[in-house]
Amino acid sequence: MLVEKVQLGDQKAFNLLVIRYQHKVASLISRYVPQGDVPDVAQEAFIKAYRAIGSFRGDSEFYTWLYRIAVNKANIYLVAQ
């Protein structure tokens, strides 16, 4: 599983996760923030996911976990505006 490889430090596996989910995350974030800011907020979500990947326990699907991170980053963006 890609997530397990990332948890073991495999950078290429994380790149594959980004490629796999970047459009879904961008689409999700675009519901909350102006289109011009979507790439920045999506990048922040992926950075947060990378830094916190060790806390992913697999109790849910990876995208469910990433979805929550992306929504939280969008909300943080909105509060800051």
How should these model regions be labeled?
Residues D40-I47, S60-N72:
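Structural recognition of an alpha-helix C-terminal capping motif at a helix-to-coil junction
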Residues Q7-L16, A26-E44:
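Short, charged helix-capping/linker segments at alpha-helix termini
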Residues M1-E4:
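Intrinsic, short, N-terminal disordered tails of RNA polymerase sigma-factor systems
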Residues Y50:
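Short acidic-aromatic loop segments in the C-terminal HATPase_c
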Residues Q11, P39, I53-D59, Y63:
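A short, glycine- and basic residue-enriched loop/turn
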Residues G54-R57, V71-Q81:
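Arg/Lys-rich amphipathic alpha helix in sigma70-family domain 2
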Residues L17-Y21, V25, A70:
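Hydrophobic/aromatic residues within well-ordered alpha-helical segments
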